[in-house]
């Protein structure tokens, strides 16, 4: 067995190597093509979608269906798209009950467009396709988002189309035929007059989460196969000063575009520590604009200028932890008052402390808690009893970890006959479902302690999963 002792610096992100970088004034500058640095795959896909040789007028993008993401995509498309000199669409001449369509002479015609990029989160039929209104015998035609995006790009949330299938069927027909036909939204109430169709050409970017994209693929398998696909990457792997610079510029850009203060040189270390808590990995930092914006919105009241320093960030994080910390404090009180029994001194046979990640539904913060695992061994037929599983409190992944641990022990003992003992393991004072395999190393140690009749030091806690060869594996959330 190899034992490697970790210093406290091994458990925190490396920020000392980038102190000179944090002090550079370039981090506060606006960078025109910030998306190409942090989202190169997405940037390339958008270029492909805008190309006249694109394989499909539709693009599927995996990203949260939030206004902030749609706005970011819209801004990126406007940067990539050359300014259009042509005018698309036209205008309708209405004389009594006669309506005629004429190509646009100028951009301010009612149904004229200049190839703009339009974003939409949730829309209804009238917002998307426009409508015909009649009042006191006078007819007016109202343009919709598709008319405003004529010659350009429509960025729309996928869930609004999945929830309203008729909207999708009509939008698909418009884009495929490059023509807009006026039809009644209610079949029982036809249009009072006939309205001539108009040419309409646009590209559509459908933005959705993984589940929405899966539902769309089931509904439109052929279109999903032909459409350009890309993803908004949630995080950035930090491997050198260049990637750290890209992340810092992304954070600064996100803050300034929302008119929020951005980090001062000494604040980056505090922000990065909070960022790795969010991602769960030391070398991975989030690109989620909602998370970034939240940090600066909360610290903004404490800032006096256009930047926020380390002291202000630390104060904001301490206030947030206190505000959200009621449940964590109550759990700690239960241990201190010995309502939950956790031994931190001495030695015990068949008992060990593990670490659990507690998540309460509706609570924004996950927190750690020590868990007491016990193992009892007795003469038997080789059965390993997982009490959590027997009581239907153990999940499938936890059961898998138990079976892997059992397989390792069988292989290690190399007995020529059936094991002459049975063992039972449990999480003591656990009254809710337990899942995950990150306790399998602690369970294995408790089992070996009980088998060998060797006590375990109770001042330590163990976490980590184990494979069939007995090797410790990394776990998240630390």
Where are these regions (language model features)?
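Conserved ASCE/P-loop NTPase catalytic core
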Residues: 1-217, 228-240, 248-370, 384-394
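Flexible glycine/proline-rich, aromatic-decorated loop/lid segments
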Residues: 220-226
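Terminal-proximal interaction/regulatory segments of ATP-powered molecular machines
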Residues: 358-478
């Amino acid at each position: 067995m190899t034992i490697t002792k970790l210093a406290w610096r091994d458990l925190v992100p490396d920020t000392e190597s980038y102190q000179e970088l944090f002090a550079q004034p370039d981090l506060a500058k606006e960078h025109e093509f910030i998306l190409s640095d942090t989202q190169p795959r997405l940037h390339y896909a958008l270029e492909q979608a805008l190309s006249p040789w694109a394989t499909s007028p539709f693009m599927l993008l995996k990203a949260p269906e939030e206004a902030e993401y749609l706005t970011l995509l819209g801004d990126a498309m406007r940067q990539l798209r050359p300014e259009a000199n042509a005018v698309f669409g036209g205008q309708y001449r209405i004389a009594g009950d006669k309506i005629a369509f004429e190509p646009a002479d100028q951009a301010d015609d009612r149904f004229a467009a200049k190839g703009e990029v339009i974003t939409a989160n949730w829309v209804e039929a009238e917002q998307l396709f426009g409508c015909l209104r009649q009042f006191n015998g006078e007819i007016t035609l109202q343009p919709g988002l598709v008319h405003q995006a004529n010659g350009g790009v429509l960025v729309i949330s996928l869930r609004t189309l999945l929830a309203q299938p008729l909207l999708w069927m009509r939008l698909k027909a418009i884009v495929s035929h490059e023509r807009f036909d006026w039809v009644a939204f209610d079949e029982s109430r036809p249009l009072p007059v006939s309205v001539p169709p108009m040419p309409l050409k646009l590209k559509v970017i459908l933005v959705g989460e993984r589940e929405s994209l899966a539902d769309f693929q089931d509904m439109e398998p052929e279109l999903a196969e032909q459409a350009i696909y890309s993803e908004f990457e949630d995080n950035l792997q930090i491997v050198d000063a260049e990637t750290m610079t890209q992340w810092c510029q992304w954070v600064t850009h996100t803050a300034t575009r929302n008119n929020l203060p951005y980090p001062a040189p000494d604040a980056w270390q505090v922000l990065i520590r909070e960022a790795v808590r969010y991602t769960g990995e030391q070398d991975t930092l989030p690109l989620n604009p909602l998370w970034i914006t939240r940090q600066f919105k909360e610290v903004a009241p404490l800032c006096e200028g256009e930047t926020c320093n380390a002291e202000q960030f630390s104060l904001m994080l301490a206030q947030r932890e206190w505000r959200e910390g009621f449940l964590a404090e109550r759990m700690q009180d239960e241990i201190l008052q010995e309502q939950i029994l956790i031994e931190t001194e001495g030695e015990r046979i068949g008992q060990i402390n593990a670490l659990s990640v507690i998540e309460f539904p509706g609570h924004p913060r996950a927190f750690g808690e020590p868990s007491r695992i016990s193992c009892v061994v007795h003469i038997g037929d080789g059965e390993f009893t997982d009490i959590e599983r027997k009581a239907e409190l153990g999940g499938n992944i936890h059961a898998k970890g138990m079976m892997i641990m059992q397989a390792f022990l069988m292989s290690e003992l190399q007995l020529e006959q059936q094991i002459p003992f049975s063992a039972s393991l449990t999480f003591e004072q656990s009254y809710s479902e337990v899942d995950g395999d990150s306790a399998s190393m602690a369970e294995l140690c408790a089992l070996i302690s009980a088998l060998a009749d060797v006590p375990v030091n109770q001042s330590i806690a163990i976490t980590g999963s184990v494979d069939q060869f007995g090797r410790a594996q990394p776990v998240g959330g630390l």
